[in-house]
Amino acid sequence: MNALLSNPFKERLRKGEVQIGLWLSSTTAYMAEIAATSGYDWLLIDGEHAPNTIQDLYHQLQAVAPYASQPVIRPVEGSKPLIKQVLDIGAQTLLIPMVDTAEQARQVVSATRYPPYGERGVGASVARAARWGRIENYMAQVNDSLCLLVQVESKTALDNLDEILDVEGIDGVFIGPADLSASLGYPDNAGHPEVQRIIETSIRRIRAAGKAAGFLAVAPDMAQQCLAWGANFVAVGVDTMLYSDALDQRLAMFKSGKNGPRIKGSY
């Protein structure tokens, strides 16, 4: 395989190695590059809840490219046209939100593969992913370097988890704590004992099926707990939340009555 198509994040998942990540919601290449120099194993560039355009995602991929931190793109949805765009700008690892059924998972896999294995539109000669046609045999090699992660974040998805795990081409399953707790009747309360029980059971089921298990935990103790349960790609913070907390904490040193750190909640 061409060295430009190597995907260290995927290789480490295959080996079962633990990878610690950070969520990027700030939408700027400048902040993304700062995060990339911090040493996180992976960086989630969020296109679902952060106001990122395709060009914003593109610039952030460029910003982190010189560093060891591996980018993961979360598009706003798993539609075929959007997946085509984020792959063409050079994303190798995708996290697709709100996947509730095995059929949805199969459709997402198909959207990432060129014919005859899928339905990805062909435009490698004008795509950063293929270095504008300079990677020889790009279409024949690229499938091995793509890493596809799906989010399970509803009761329906939990009911279908085993079938989703059976879908060929899915490398990992990410438990979405905020939406999941809301779907289970405990909004903004991923720490509820019943939600915690379901998260633990789900992580163990994912790993038992031979897939990677992921999670976002803004509270350090929750992150440690998920790692203990077997999750092997865990994001331990969100850049905008960390920035906001640092601002509040610094101001509280000089102004009475101001609050200190406020990081809490499911997300």
UniProtKB/Swiss-Prot annotation:
Mg(2+) binds at E153, D179. Binds 1 Mg(2+) ion per subunit. Is more efficient when using Ni(2+) ion, although it is not likely to be the physiologically relevant active site metal. The record marks R74 as: Transition state stabilizer. One of its GO terms (cellular component) is cytoplasm. Its cofactor is Mg(2+); Ni(2+). Substrate binds at Q151, A178, D179. Changing H49A: Loss of 2-keto-3-deoxy-L-rhamnonate aldolase activity. Changing R74A: Loss of 2-keto-3-deoxy-L-rhamnonate aldolase activity. Belongs to the HpcH/HpaI aldolase family. KDR aldolase subfamily. This is 2-keto-3-deoxy-L-rhamnonate aldolase. It comes from Escherichia coli (strain K12). The gene is rhmA.
